[in-house]
């Protein structure tokens, strides 16, 4: 039998299991996606998906006419709350009058439930639907009503070519190659990787439905993020209760981002 040298554990839900397995195979390197537990042979990895989420918010804010944007969300955890907030901050920058209405599904993947949530938001009058789900059901539901859609994870344009605007996307291959090279060069050490657009592990895709001027604006904001000239969470940021979380020019630390449990004030719905 050939010895396995590297294992990627690709879901948050695998965390406790991979911790136990790593103890039993000290000669194998384990990398766990989106977790927070580490060991000598166990590291974690994720991406700053909030960066492209902010950019898609700019698009949604510009494209809405009703000033009501729907968001189909998975779980009330910092990863998801952070992404919704980044999206909402982008929306507010483009359109201070727009609100984001959030419906929670409490699942990563349940197409029928996701479609139901999207339909409820469409019935409220949403003319843009965004999501943090693993299926394209919300995108498809929007498309069936002729409403703009913003996907998640991958380019979902094939599921609603006439209404798909944009999506934050993952480029995991770049990270996998990096880890494999570190291991082959005997340079791998356990760490907690959190890469952004500048690393190539996350990015944004846009369809031709995005007007040229808006596309140029998004590209410029993307460039500023890469050059560390702009942070999506740069203050002033005010939460739903009217508290100033970050004053002008202030930005949260990574620790604060990783523990985020509050919504900015243009979101309708509770993060609790």
What are these regions (language model features)?
Residues 1-272:
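A residue-level marker of the well-folded mature domains of exported/periplasmic proteins
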């Amino acid at each position: 039998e050939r010895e396995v040298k590297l294992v990627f554990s690709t879901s948050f839900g695998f965390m406790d299991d991979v911790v136990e397995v790593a103890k039993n195979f000290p000669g194998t390197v384990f990398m766990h996606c989106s977790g927070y537990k580490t060991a000598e042979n166990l590291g974690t990895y994720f991406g700053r998906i909030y960066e492209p989420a902010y950019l898609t918010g700019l698009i949604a804010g510009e494209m809405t006419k009703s000033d009501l944007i729907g968001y189909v969300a998975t779980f009330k955890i910092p990863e998801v709350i952070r992404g919704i907030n980044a999206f909402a901050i982008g929306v507010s920058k483009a359109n201070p009058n727009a609100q984001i209405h959030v419906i929670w599904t409490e699942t990563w993947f349940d197409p029928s439930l996701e479609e139901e949530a999207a339909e409820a938001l469409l019935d409220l009058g949403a003319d843009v639907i965004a999501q943090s789900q693993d299926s394209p059901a919300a995108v498809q539901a929007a498309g069936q009503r002729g409403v703009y859609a913003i996907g998640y994870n991958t380019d979902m344009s094939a599921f609603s070519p006439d209404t798909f605007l944009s999506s934050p996307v993952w480029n995991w291959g770049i990270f996998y190659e990096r880890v494999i090279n570190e291991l082959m060069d005997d340079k791998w050490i356990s760490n907690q990787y959190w890469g952004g657009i500048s690393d190539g592990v996350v990015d944004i895709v846009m369809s031709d439905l995005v007007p040229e001027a808006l596309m140029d604006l998004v590209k410029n904001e993307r460039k500023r993020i890469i050059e560390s000239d702009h942070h999506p969470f740069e203050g002033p940021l005010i939460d739903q209760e009217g508290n100033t979380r970050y004053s002008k020019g202030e930005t949260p630390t990574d620790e604060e981002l990783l523990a985020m449990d509050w919504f900015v004030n243009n979101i309708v719905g509770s993060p609790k």
